[in-house]
Each structure stands twice: as C-alpha cells, then as structure tokens.
C-alpha cells in the first residue's frame, strides 16, 4: 500500500473521528432536559433545607456497643425532625487555595483562589456558588425519626467572629461549630482546612448527656442546578463529561449522565467506603466517607437540581456516650498530584482521558511523560515539543522501515504495471499475481501503515489529555499562545500545519497515483488546517512539531536511499 493511500486513510479516519465526537456533543445537548430552564429555582441557602420525608424510616437500631454506628437505613426515603433554628450567620474560612462561605451545615460558596476564571487575572473560579440561577452547594446534615437533630441554621461557630483565615506559617485551620439540642444532646462539628489541600475534613461528634438513647444518621449531599453548555469545538468546557460518578470497592467505577440514571430509576445502593462526585470540566466536588463506613448512595433529581447523596451511618448513642463520624469533602481541580495524595482508591478516575480503557491508559502514560518533561523544562508547551521528539525517536525504526517499504514498492512499480496490463480487468488474477510478487520479493504492502496506525491512538489520547488536564489550563507556551487548552487565537499554528503538510506532499513520491487520489490529496492540507483551527493549540503544536520532524526525516531518508528530493518535487509538480 503506497504512502499516499495510507495518508488518505489516516486523514479520513481522523476526520470521521472528530466528526463523531462533535456529533456526540450535539446529541448530548439535544438530550439535555429543557424543562429545567423553566422550573423555579429556590434561593441558594434553601438548597439544603429539604430533609428526607418521614415515610419508611427504620426504627432506631437495637443499641449496639455504646456510641457505635448501626446499620444504614435500608430505604431511600428518610426523615428528619430538626430542632427549631433561625438563620445562622455565614462564616468565611480561607486557606491558601480555598475561600469557603458556610453556615455550619452547608458550604454555600467555594472559590478556588489559585484558578482565575480567565487568563487576565479576574475573580477566582467559584465551584460552589449561591448564584440564583445555578446554585451549587454541599450539605452535611442529620436525620432521625424521633430524636432531635439540627436543622438549617442550627450550627453556630464556637469562636466569635465570622472570618477565619490560615495564617502565615500555619499549616492547619481548625474551626469548630456546635449545635446544642434539647435535653442535653449536642453535636460538635469541626471543619479542618490544610495548606495546599482541596479536601476539607469534617468531623461530627454526637454527645448525649440526656437520660435516653439518641438515634439518628448523617446525610451528605451535593446539590447542583446544572448549566446547559453551548456545544461545539470552540467551547472547551463542553468537551468534558458533566454529570455524576461514584466508586465502590465492590462494584468499581461508574460514570453516567443524570438523565441516564433517572431513566433507570436513579441510584439507590448500599456501599462500604467509596466516594460520590459531581464532575465538570477541570473541576469536581466529592464526598469521601471513611473506608469502613457503610452508606446508602443515592442519585436523584429534586426539581431542577441534580443531587448526589450519601446517607449513613446510623447511630444509637447511649446516655453519657459520644459517637463520632468523619468524611472529606473535595472541592477543587482535577490535579493528578493532589488527588494521589488523598490516597482514595479510584478517585483518580475523575480525570477522564477517555471512555475507552486502552485510550485512557495511553493518556495516563502521555501525561506521566509530559509531567516529567515539565519538571525539567518548566513550560507545558516545551514539554509537548519534548514529547514529540521522544516519540519520533521511539518510532524512528518504524519510520525507517516504512520508507524502505515504500522505496521497494516504487522499485517494483514497472513490474506491477506489467501485471496490470497482462491481466487487464481480471482483478482476481491481478491481485493473486501481485501478492505472489510481494511474497517472492519479501515486500510487506502494509509496511507503510504501521507508524501511522500507532500514531492515531497517541494523537487522540493526547487530544483528551490536553482537554482534560487542569494542569495545562491557561498554561502559556510562548508569544501569542497563552493557553494551550484553547484554540490558537491568531491561527498561526494551523497555518504552519498546512504549510508543512503541503511540503510533505511535495516530497512524497507518488508514482502511478490515481488522478482522483491526486486531487483529494491537494485538498487534505486545507481540510486538516480547518480542523486544527478549532482544537486546543497544544494539540496543533504537537502536530506541527511532529510534521516538521517527519518532513526532515523524510528528506534525510530520501538522500540516504540515493534519491534526489528535488527530482521528487519536480515529478509531483507535473
């Protein structure tokens, strides 16, 4: 198979794959529930007010060891009898990476201080928000059938003031809240923020100084009115998955759109350990319970809101005893290094390099190489250039074999022409004779395909690495490229790509090429250039450097085999 045909196959496969991905985005947009836009949305601080209904709540468990957790409620419908409470003052907690606004029960707003919304240094990204149209909150509450529990506004900060900040030289910020219920029952909730960490530790201590056992269970939920994103290659935010995901040691990892969950009746599963999360481009929130903690995992819709929830464990706290439960709330970016430090099994799956496992593995490998190159070069753009150089070195033996195969094919073109003339329209005999010739002369007709076929999964895996990696978000290369995950604003790299592809065509021998193929080849640089104008500039940088190196290697190999590049260029110009 000659190089021209291989290139055409590769080109059309790329076009088809990109069109398929774009069609998938448009289809997802068409399937998005339009009714959500017309439903009334409550105020942001009311998002956590709804507690489960009073129906079918299991009775208090027989008292186990004092203070020990009981079983998780076996149904998805639960209740709460909150003690009367007013509106709690909003308290602000600030670390070096997070600024949180909370009332002790819900985190109402969370700003990611090291991630501005735009490159020009605007306000930081608000992952959790009180925005009236699209509120997004994280709540941790208590529910019970008979015992008093804190309602909205029930918790109060133990220390005076409404602003607490991680001081210089301090690595941990600890802020306790308390709810004092009737009859001597209280719950002490402690928020712990650490320097450089996006996981917030939340510890609850149920202290029973009453004369009767206290029964209840904790629920933790993420509640979001999703934003309907405009779909298209010019909107990177629409490329990434936006929905719910969860993981359990028993069932593994699952990621689906809320619509798919609702079509199947939602999620209602008892799990020990694991985690549940809401994902969006570059960022996510997640509730991470203790490894030995049993919870009821619930995914459902509450009007226009997507709700991901953990219910449990249930507690029976004997008089004079204390029960404790802890969890982590992740509010932050999909940073590989920081996620790994949490040591939570499966949490790295929130970084979605591909829905296909083999492509995800390739993507993880590419990012590993990129991150190590970045540690030396201190620039993600130059790390991409370094990755291309490494790949070309690894693939050089295949490229050399490809050119040798192509050169051998050109050598036998006159004999192939004789066979075609001999057998005329009898294609079966012509193919048989051709294969016998290849076998006799030890020619591999597929020799030119292998390097390109190997590059295809690398190319598409790198596409998803660039789209998904928050490390590259707003990362500059040089000059006009100030964000490698966004398109080239001046289309310089796509133009260079067109020029390099055109030069490669002129340097590629095409003896006996079909006239129709020749016309198609003339348009391929323009087709690729148009596609590259709307994909991340980091991907175009990869393709430009790869194409430039390939052009130089091809020039050198032509001379190594005793051919003259100028002669090939003149032959292609005819």
UniProtKB/Swiss-Prot annotation:
Subcellular location: Cell inner membrane
GO cellular component: plasma membrane
Entry's Gene Ontology BP terms: protein insertion into membrane; protein transport
Spans through the membrane: 6-26, 350-370, 376-396, 447-467, 491-511, 525-545
UniProt keyword list: Cell inner membrane, Cell membrane, Chaperone, Membrane, Protein transport, Transmembrane, Transmembrane helix, Transport
Keyword Protein transport assigned: yes
InterPro entries: Membr_insert_YidC (IPR019998), Membr_insert_YidC_N (IPR028053), YidC/ALB3/OXA1/COX18 (IPR001708), YidC/Oxa/ALB_C (IPR028055), YidC_ALB_C (IPR047196), YidC_periplasmic_sf (IPR038221)
Main location: membrane
GO molecular function: membrane insertase activity
Region feature (Disordered): 65-85
Bilayer disposition of the protein: Multi-pass membrane protein
Pfam families associated with the record: 60KD_IMP (PF02096), YidC_periplas (PF14849)
Subunit field text: Interacts with the Sec translocase complex via SecD. Specifically interacts with transmembrane segments of nascent integral membrane proteins during membrane integration.
NCBIfam families: PRK01318.1-3, yidC_nterm, yidC_oxa1_cterm
General function of this protein: Required for the insertion and/or proper folding and/or complex formation of integral membrane proteins into the membrane. Involved in integration of membrane proteins that insert both dependently and independently of the Sec translocase complex, as well as at least some lipoproteins. Aids folding of multispanning membrane proteins.
Family designation: Belongs to the OXA1/ALB3/YidC family. Type 1 subfamily.
Name of the protein this chain belongs to: Membrane protein insertase YidC
Source species: Xanthomonas oryzae pv. oryzae (strain PXO99A)
Encoding gene per record: yidC
